[in-house]
Amino acid sequence: GCGGGDKKDDKKPAAQKFINIATGGTSGTYFPLGGALADILNKNIPGTNASAQSTGASVANVNLLSQGKVEIAFIQNDIAYYAANGTEMFKGKQVAGLQGLATLYPETVQIVTLKKSGIKSVADFKGKRIAVGAAGSGTEANARQIMEAYGIKYDDIKVQYLSFGEAASALKDGNVDAAFVTAGHPTAAIQDIATQNDVVLVPVDADKADALIKKYPFYTKLVIKAGTYPKQDADVTAVAVKCMLAVTDKMDENTAYAIAKALYGNLDRMKSAHSAANAISK
Protein backbone atom coordinates (compact mmCIF):
# COMPACT_ATOMS: atom_id res chain seq x y z
CA GLY A 1 0.00 0.00 0.00
CA CYS A 2 1.01 3.66 0.13
CA GLY A 3 2.26 5.65 3.09
CA GLY A 4 0.12 7.71 5.48
CA GLY A 5 -1.00 11.31 4.97
CA ASP A 6 1.34 14.18 5.75
CA LYS A 7 1.13 16.40 8.83
CA LYS A 8 -1.03 19.27 7.61
CA ASP A 9 -3.83 16.98 6.37
CA ASP A 10 -4.67 15.35 9.70
CA LYS A 11 -8.42 15.67 9.12
CA LYS A 12 -8.31 13.45 6.01
CA PRO A 13 -9.19 9.76 6.43
CA ALA A 14 -6.39 7.20 6.38
CA ALA A 15 -4.56 6.86 3.07
CA GLN A 16 -6.40 4.80 0.51
CA LYS A 17 -5.02 1.41 -0.33
CA PHE A 18 -4.52 1.23 -4.09
CA ILE A 19 -4.88 -2.24 -5.55
CA ASN A 20 -4.04 -2.55 -9.22
CA ILE A 21 -5.30 -5.75 -10.84
CA ALA A 22 -3.60 -7.05 -13.98
CA THR A 23 -6.01 -8.92 -16.27
CA GLY A 24 -5.64 -9.69 -19.99
CA GLY A 25 -6.90 -8.45 -23.35
CA THR A 26 -10.29 -6.73 -23.40
CA SER A 27 -11.92 -9.60 -25.33
CA GLY A 28 -10.76 -12.37 -22.97
CA THR A 29 -12.13 -13.73 -19.69
CA TYR A 30 -9.62 -12.09 -17.32
CA PHE A 31 -10.66 -8.53 -18.15
CA PRO A 32 -14.37 -8.73 -17.16
CA LEU A 33 -13.51 -10.88 -14.12
CA GLY A 34 -10.85 -8.39 -13.03
CA GLY A 35 -13.38 -5.57 -13.30
CA ALA A 36 -15.79 -7.57 -11.13
CA LEU A 37 -13.04 -8.28 -8.59
CA ALA A 38 -12.17 -4.57 -8.38
CA ASP A 39 -15.84 -3.81 -7.80
CA ILE A 40 -16.04 -6.46 -5.03
CA LEU A 41 -12.93 -5.12 -3.28
CA ASN A 42 -14.09 -1.49 -3.48
CA LYS A 43 -17.46 -2.38 -1.96
CA ASN A 44 -16.23 -4.78 0.72
CA ILE A 45 -12.85 -3.56 1.96
CA PRO A 46 -13.01 -0.04 3.45
CA GLY A 47 -10.42 2.43 2.13
CA THR A 48 -9.64 0.34 -0.93
CA ASN A 49 -9.24 1.85 -4.37
CA ALA A 50 -9.05 -1.17 -6.68
CA SER A 51 -8.94 -0.99 -10.45
CA ALA A 52 -8.46 -3.53 -13.24
CA GLN A 53 -6.22 -2.87 -16.21
CA SER A 54 -6.02 -4.69 -19.53
CA THR A 55 -2.61 -6.28 -20.17
CA GLY A 56 -0.86 -8.84 -22.35
CA ALA A 57 -2.09 -11.62 -20.00
CA SER A 58 -0.18 -14.21 -17.94
CA VAL A 59 3.47 -13.69 -18.90
CA ALA A 60 3.18 -9.89 -18.86
CA ASN A 61 1.27 -10.09 -15.57
CA VAL A 62 4.04 -12.02 -13.80
CA ASN A 63 6.47 -9.29 -14.83
CA LEU A 64 4.11 -6.51 -13.68
CA LEU A 65 3.75 -8.27 -10.30
CA SER A 66 7.48 -8.80 -9.85
CA GLN A 67 8.16 -5.14 -10.77
CA GLY A 68 5.61 -4.00 -8.15
CA LYS A 69 3.45 -2.30 -10.79
CA VAL A 70 0.36 -4.30 -9.81
CA GLU A 71 -0.72 -5.93 -6.55
CA ILE A 72 -2.87 -8.76 -7.95
CA ALA A 73 -2.62 -10.60 -11.25
CA PHE A 74 -4.72 -13.14 -13.09
CA ILE A 75 -2.31 -15.80 -14.35
CA GLN A 76 -2.37 -19.40 -15.50
CA ASN A 77 -0.84 -21.84 -13.03
CA ASP A 78 1.51 -23.21 -15.71
CA ILE A 79 2.99 -19.74 -16.25
CA ALA A 80 3.36 -19.35 -12.46
CA TYR A 81 5.18 -22.72 -12.43
CA TYR A 82 7.60 -21.62 -15.18
CA ALA A 83 8.24 -18.29 -13.42
CA ALA A 84 8.91 -19.90 -10.03
CA ASN A 85 11.18 -22.54 -11.60
CA GLY A 86 12.91 -20.36 -14.19
CA THR A 87 11.83 -22.50 -17.16
CA GLU A 88 10.21 -21.92 -20.59
CA MET A 89 9.71 -18.17 -21.20
CA PHE A 90 11.30 -17.50 -17.78
CA LYS A 91 14.49 -19.47 -18.51
CA GLY A 92 17.26 -17.67 -16.64
CA LYS A 93 14.69 -15.18 -15.29
CA GLN A 94 13.32 -16.98 -12.24
CA VAL A 95 10.79 -14.90 -10.28
CA ALA A 96 10.99 -15.12 -6.50
CA GLY A 97 8.13 -14.36 -4.13
CA LEU A 98 5.12 -15.29 -6.29
CA GLN A 99 2.21 -16.55 -4.21
CA GLY A 100 -1.18 -17.94 -5.09
CA LEU A 101 -4.14 -16.18 -3.50
CA ALA A 102 -6.92 -18.26 -5.09
CA THR A 103 -7.40 -20.88 -7.79
CA LEU A 104 -10.33 -19.87 -9.96
CA TYR A 105 -11.36 -22.07 -12.90
CA PRO A 106 -9.93 -24.38 -15.54
CA GLU A 107 -8.50 -22.92 -18.74
CA THR A 108 -8.96 -25.65 -21.26
CA VAL A 109 -6.35 -26.30 -23.92
CA GLN A 110 -8.72 -26.54 -26.89
CA ILE A 111 -7.45 -27.93 -30.17
CA VAL A 112 -9.65 -26.68 -32.98
CA THR A 113 -9.88 -27.85 -36.57
CA LEU A 114 -12.52 -27.92 -39.30
CA LYS A 115 -14.19 -31.15 -40.36
CA LYS A 116 -12.84 -30.84 -43.90
CA SER A 117 -9.21 -31.05 -42.63
CA GLY A 118 -9.72 -34.75 -41.82
CA ILE A 119 -7.71 -34.30 -38.60
CA LYS A 120 -9.07 -36.54 -35.84
CA SER A 121 -6.06 -36.81 -33.53
CA VAL A 122 -2.93 -34.84 -32.64
CA ALA A 123 -1.14 -37.80 -34.28
CA ASP A 124 -2.52 -36.51 -37.62
CA PHE A 125 -0.63 -33.20 -37.33
CA LYS A 126 2.47 -34.30 -39.25
CA GLY A 127 3.06 -32.01 -42.23
CA LYS A 128 0.07 -29.82 -41.34
CA ARG A 129 -0.09 -26.08 -40.67
CA ILE A 130 -0.66 -25.72 -36.94
CA ALA A 131 -1.31 -22.42 -35.13
CA VAL A 132 0.39 -22.90 -31.77
CA GLY A 133 -0.27 -19.50 -30.19
CA ALA A 134 1.90 -16.39 -30.09
CA ALA A 135 5.64 -17.13 -29.76
CA GLY A 136 6.63 -17.48 -26.10
CA SER A 137 3.02 -17.56 -24.90
CA GLY A 138 1.47 -20.00 -22.44
CA THR A 139 -0.64 -21.45 -25.26
CA GLU A 140 2.49 -22.13 -27.28
CA ALA A 141 4.05 -24.06 -24.37
CA ASN A 142 0.79 -26.06 -24.01
CA ALA A 143 0.83 -26.85 -27.74
CA ARG A 144 4.46 -27.98 -27.68
CA GLN A 145 3.96 -30.16 -24.59
CA ILE A 146 0.80 -31.84 -25.91
CA MET A 147 2.40 -32.56 -29.29
CA GLU A 148 5.47 -33.89 -27.49
CA ALA A 149 3.20 -36.40 -25.68
CA TYR A 150 2.25 -37.66 -29.16
CA GLY A 151 5.87 -37.75 -30.32
CA ILE A 152 5.41 -34.76 -32.63
CA LYS A 153 8.04 -32.02 -32.77
CA TYR A 154 7.92 -28.59 -34.42
CA ASP A 155 10.10 -30.02 -37.20
CA ASP A 156 7.25 -32.41 -38.07
CA ILE A 157 4.69 -29.65 -38.65
CA LYS A 158 4.43 -26.22 -40.28
CA VAL A 159 4.42 -24.00 -37.19
CA GLN A 160 2.31 -20.84 -37.31
CA TYR A 161 2.87 -18.45 -34.39
CA LEU A 162 -0.55 -16.83 -34.26
CA SER A 163 -2.59 -15.42 -31.41
CA PHE A 164 -5.99 -17.06 -31.24
CA GLY A 165 -7.73 -14.10 -32.88
CA GLU A 166 -5.39 -14.43 -35.87
CA ALA A 167 -5.64 -18.24 -35.84
CA ALA A 168 -9.45 -18.07 -35.90
CA SER A 169 -9.35 -15.98 -39.08
CA ALA A 170 -6.71 -18.26 -40.60
CA LEU A 171 -8.83 -21.35 -39.83
CA LYS A 172 -11.89 -19.78 -41.45
CA ASP A 173 -9.86 -18.75 -44.50
CA GLY A 174 -8.24 -22.18 -44.84
CA ASN A 175 -4.74 -20.87 -44.08
CA VAL A 176 -4.13 -23.15 -41.09
CA ASP A 177 -5.28 -26.73 -40.49
CA ALA A 178 -5.64 -26.63 -36.70
CA ALA A 179 -5.16 -24.19 -33.85
CA PHE A 180 -4.56 -24.32 -30.11
CA VAL A 181 -6.42 -21.99 -27.77
CA THR A 182 -6.10 -22.03 -23.99
CA ALA A 183 -9.16 -20.38 -22.44
CA GLY A 184 -12.15 -21.06 -20.23
CA HIS A 185 -14.76 -22.82 -22.33
CA PRO A 186 -17.07 -22.08 -24.06
CA THR A 187 -14.71 -19.64 -25.78
CA ALA A 188 -16.39 -16.88 -27.80
CA ALA A 189 -13.89 -17.04 -30.66
CA ILE A 190 -14.54 -20.78 -31.15
CA GLN A 191 -18.31 -20.27 -30.95
CA ASP A 192 -17.91 -17.62 -33.62
CA ILE A 193 -16.11 -20.00 -36.03
CA ALA A 194 -18.58 -22.80 -35.25
CA THR A 195 -21.61 -20.74 -36.32
CA GLN A 196 -20.37 -20.69 -39.94
CA ASN A 197 -18.15 -23.79 -40.14
CA ASP A 198 -18.13 -27.44 -39.07
CA VAL A 199 -15.73 -27.21 -36.16
CA VAL A 200 -14.09 -30.32 -34.72
CA LEU A 201 -12.38 -30.35 -31.32
CA VAL A 202 -9.38 -32.69 -31.32
CA PRO A 203 -9.18 -34.78 -28.12
CA VAL A 204 -6.19 -35.43 -25.87
CA ASP A 205 -6.35 -39.18 -25.20
CA ALA A 206 -6.36 -40.34 -21.57
CA ASP A 207 -3.00 -42.15 -21.73
CA LYS A 208 -1.33 -39.09 -23.30
CA ALA A 209 -2.95 -36.83 -20.69
CA ASP A 210 -1.60 -39.06 -17.89
CA ALA A 211 1.92 -38.90 -19.34
CA LEU A 212 1.61 -35.13 -19.67
CA ILE A 213 0.47 -34.67 -16.06
CA LYS A 214 3.33 -36.84 -14.81
CA LYS A 215 5.83 -34.57 -16.51
CA TYR A 216 3.99 -31.25 -16.04
CA PRO A 217 2.01 -31.35 -12.76
CA PHE A 218 0.01 -28.19 -13.48
CA TYR A 219 -2.27 -29.98 -15.98
CA THR A 220 -5.60 -31.57 -15.08
CA LYS A 221 -7.92 -33.72 -17.17
CA LEU A 222 -11.40 -32.56 -18.04
CA VAL A 223 -14.19 -33.14 -20.53
CA ILE A 224 -15.62 -30.58 -22.93
CA LYS A 225 -19.24 -31.70 -22.77
CA ALA A 226 -21.29 -32.35 -25.90
CA GLY A 227 -23.26 -29.24 -26.85
CA THR A 228 -20.61 -26.82 -25.57
CA TYR A 229 -20.26 -25.60 -29.16
CA PRO A 230 -22.69 -25.59 -32.09
CA LYS A 231 -22.97 -29.03 -33.73
CA GLN A 232 -20.68 -30.64 -31.11
CA ASP A 233 -22.48 -33.95 -30.60
CA ALA A 234 -19.97 -35.84 -28.43
CA ASP A 235 -17.92 -35.23 -25.29
CA VAL A 236 -14.26 -34.40 -25.96
CA THR A 237 -11.45 -35.34 -23.56
CA ALA A 238 -9.04 -32.49 -22.92
CA VAL A 239 -6.45 -31.15 -20.52
CA ALA A 240 -6.58 -27.83 -18.74
CA VAL A 241 -4.44 -25.48 -16.72
CA LYS A 242 -5.96 -23.31 -13.99
CA CYS A 243 -6.55 -19.62 -13.81
CA MET A 244 -5.29 -18.29 -10.49
CA LEU A 245 -4.98 -14.99 -8.67
CA ALA A 246 -1.36 -14.32 -7.81
CA VAL A 247 0.20 -11.81 -5.44
CA THR A 248 3.75 -11.44 -4.14
CA ASP A 249 5.12 -12.03 -0.66
CA LYS A 250 5.19 -8.22 -0.26
CA MET A 251 1.42 -8.22 0.34
CA ASP A 252 0.65 -8.38 4.05
CA GLU A 253 -1.38 -11.34 5.26
CA ASN A 254 -4.32 -9.26 6.49
CA THR A 255 -4.81 -7.69 3.06
CA ALA A 256 -4.49 -11.07 1.32
CA TYR A 257 -7.03 -12.59 3.70
CA ALA A 258 -9.47 -9.68 3.25
CA ILE A 259 -9.23 -9.99 -0.55
CA ALA A 260 -9.81 -13.76 -0.55
CA LYS A 261 -12.71 -13.40 1.89
CA ALA A 262 -14.36 -10.66 -0.21
CA LEU A 263 -13.88 -12.71 -3.40
CA TYR A 264 -15.36 -15.94 -2.05
CA GLY A 265 -18.20 -14.08 -0.32
CA ASN A 266 -19.23 -12.46 -3.61
CA LEU A 267 -18.86 -15.15 -6.26
CA ASP A 268 -22.24 -14.21 -7.75
CA ARG A 269 -20.74 -10.89 -8.86
CA MET A 270 -17.89 -12.79 -10.57
CA LYS A 271 -20.35 -15.18 -12.23
CA SER A 272 -22.41 -12.31 -13.59
CA ALA A 273 -19.25 -10.90 -15.21
CA HIS A 274 -18.31 -14.10 -17.09
CA SER A 275 -19.66 -17.65 -17.21
CA ALA A 276 -16.15 -19.09 -16.70
CA ALA A 277 -16.56 -18.05 -13.04
CA ASN A 278 -19.31 -20.66 -12.63
CA ALA A 279 -16.50 -23.19 -12.14
CA ILE A 280 -15.01 -21.34 -9.14
CA SER A 281 -15.60 -23.29 -5.94
CA LYS A 282 -14.87 -22.18 -2.40
What role is predicted for each listed range?
Residues C2-A14:
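Bacterial lipoprotein signal-peptidase II cleavage site
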Residues K11-K126, A131-A134:
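Short, glycine-/small- and polar/acidic-enriched structural segments
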Residues Q16-F18, N42-S54, E148-L162, N175-A178, ...:
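A local structural motif
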Residues G28-P32, G56-V59, K116, A134-A141, ...:
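Soluble non-cytosolic domains of exported or imported proteins
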Residues F31-A38, V59-V62, L98, V122, ...:
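Extracytoplasmic/secreted envelope proteins and their assembly/folding machinery
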Residues N77-I79, T87-M89, S117, K153-M251:
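Pocket-lining segment of extracytoplasmic ligand-binding domains
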Residues V236-K282:
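Segments of small-molecule ligand-sensing domains
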